[in-house]
């Protein structure tokens, strides 16, 4: 230990974050070190600009949507705990977690929470539905100008037609889950964090 990261995180904070996110002590310490290196203002929070300096997010077509997921509504800064809560959605599900206490809170990295997180990336206006326009905006972010507007419109129309079960021309969370029921979301939405 003895690093700057370990001295600035109190043991009780470390335990609370471990319990809430499922990360190990060493993972939390390592991620705290990364957090402080990103904190250019050295004020214990990250801004959107701090995130935009991360090369992997800067080149990701959904980078802005992912960055926005770190910030609570109306906030322009995120503290370490909020940072860890968002990252926890991407923590792989370990074998020993599959038989967790059914009465306890659902882990942030559960299939359901990963699906909610993904759904929110598409639900731009936060009305609990993915409209054709929202789908078009996200598709445009992902493919850039490589596909014509007409082709994108066809993809969006077909996607909504296949997913929309109640005929409202939008995709609800329930319909989103149904479409992805055979997709290994747990694996596809996981990042390996060093121990």
Swiss-Prot record:
Report the membrane topology from the UniProt record.
Lipid-anchor
Q: Which CDD domains match?
A: EFh
Give yes or no: UniProt keyword Nucleotide-binding: no
Instruction: Note one Pfam family from the annotation.
Output: EF-hand_7
Major localization class: nucleus
Lipid attachment locations (N-myristoyl glycine): 2
Coiled-coil regions listed: none
Q: A single GO BP annotation from the record?
A: positive regulation of protein targeting to membrane
Q: What is this protein called?
A: Calcineurin B homologous protein 1
Organism equals Bos taurus
